[in-house]
Design a protein with these regions (language model features):
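Single conserved hydrophobic/aromatic residue that forms the stacking wall/gate
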Residues: 1-14
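Extracellular ligand-binding/catalytic regions of CAZymes and related secreted enzymes
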Residues: 32, 104, 131, 217, ...
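A glycine-rich, often tryptophan-bearing local segment used as a flexible ligand/cofactor-contacting loop or short
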Residues: 89-168
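Catalytic beta-strand/loop cores that center a nucleophilic Ser/Cys/Thr
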Residues: 152-226, 234-241
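Amphipathic alpha-helical scaffolding segments comprising HEAT/armadillo-like alpha-solenoid repeats
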Residues: 283-292, 313-325, 344-356, 378-381
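Short inter-helical turns and helix N-cap capping residues of alpha-solenoid HEAT/ARM repeat scaffolds
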Residues: 296-297, 327-328, 359-360
Length: 381
């Protein structure tokens, strides 16, 4: 034969990959094509959660893109790009100046861009910070960026109520905030933005951050950029059960798409109706539960999951995956409930696998209910 069987397999895989790219570039049923940047500086959980949020919209399809993909022309096959949370300057370094100019040209041509937390920071015009200068804002008090995190309150402006009518009658709504930038208008670039929401929570739990810095500041801002649009969120709706749908709605705004209703299973702002900020004592307790999951008894693990879910722990979502396969059926069931009740779609396939291999029939039935509850977030095909 001309090629060895191993080489033949490689060529087959390459052919499948190229066919997949071809299908993606054409779109599926004219779906909007969204790329989530996956590079050094982007937090892995933020990438997972951003992908999951886009999957809630029946008119969108999503993939990850790397800095090499951008250089190779991947933006030609996208309608919108999302820069997720993590560390904005590190994402800047990973992208490189030429790729950032490719992204700017992509937006100028009429496409959309959404920046989440670090992504919003990257979009600013902040002196002394590596950024792209595309959203008309600048960050202040950057020496206290590690100011804290937790479920935080915001209020919508008149324009924000048009984009998020599901929240229009609420005085306040709540999503996860994690050390996002404190924004004011840039002094240097004439790029006006519209404030869609105002932060109502004063976060200064860590890093000797001053009080009254985050409250009454822009929470969501949106602007025109050439023929395209940019939306910047200093918070993490994608990491907030019941509020993940806000991310595809932001994408819709950047592409001038109509507002469409999502199901009641997806839109659930009543899950959080108060601030839940992590204090230093809370953070110490949270860190201790890492060891509990390694060495604790079943009852200790379940108690830890109860507390971590109640306070909407940021770190716990990275720890629960393996608990689906704990030696204790009670722990396995509680881990499944944690994942389902926190709408953690990134672990849907793990939960499905756990259900399939579960040996205890009562536990299996309960876990299957949690699986179906989580799966119900996805639009019907």
């Amino acid at each position: 034969p001309l090629y060895s069987s191993a080489a033949s397999d490689v060529y087959k895989r390459q052919a499948v990959y190229l066919v997949g790219l071809s299908v993606w570039s054409m779109g599926v049923g004219n779906k909007v094509r969204v790329g989530v940047f996956q590079g050094n500086g982007g937090a892995q959980t933020c990438i997972w959660e951003t992908i999951a949020s886009i999957q809630l919209d029946p008119d969108m399809m999503v993939r990850t893109i790397t800095t090499g993909d951008i250089a190779n022309g991947a933006l030609r096959d996208l309608d919108a790009i999302i820069i997720p949370g993590g560390e904005g300057a590190t994402q800047y370094m990973n992208l490189g100046e030429e790729n950032m100019e490719r992204i700017r040209n992509f937006i100028r041509s009429g496409k959309g861009a959404v920046g989440i937390c670090a992504g919003a920071y990257l979009f600013t015009d902040t002196p002394g910070y590596a950024c792209m200068h595309i959203n008309g804002g600048k960050a202040i008090d950057i020496e206290h960026d590690n100011r804290g995190h937790g479920i935080s309150a915001f209020s919508l402006t008149a324009e924000g109520k048009k984009l998020f009518p599901e929240l229009a009658k609420r005085d306040k709504s709540y999503v996860m905030y994690y050390e996002g930038p404190v924004l004011v208008k840039s002094d240097n670039i004439p790029l006006p933005y519209t404030t869609m929401a105002i932060m109502e929570t004063d976060v200064h739990e860590e890093g000797n951050a001053p009080a009254n810095m985050t409250n009454n500041r822009p929470f969501f801002i949106a602007n025109e950029y050439g023929k395209g649009r940019v939306f910047s969120s200093i918070s993490h709706p994608e990491a907030t059960p019941g509020m993940m749908w806000m991310i595809p709605r932001m994408v819709r705004w950047t592409l001038r798409m109509p507002v469409v209703a999502y199901s009641k299973r997806v839109v659930n702002p009543d899950l959080y109706n108060r601030e839940i900020l992590m204090t230093k004592d809370d953070l110490r307790k949270e860190r201790g539960y890492y060891r509990t999951f390694l060495y604790g008894s079943p009852n200790e693990k379940i108690a830890a999951l109860d507390w971590l879910q109640a306070c909407r722990s940021w770190d716990a979502k990275r720890w629960v995956q393996g608990l689906l396969f704990d030696n204790s059926p009670a722990v396995r069931e509680r881990a499944a409930r944690f994942i389902a009740e926190t709408d953690y779609l990134p672990f849907l396939s793990d939960l499905e696998a756990a259900c399939r291999v579960e040996r205890d029939e009562q536990t299996k039935q309960s876990m299957m209910r949690h699986f179906e509850h989580l799966k119900a977030l996805l639009p019907h095909k």
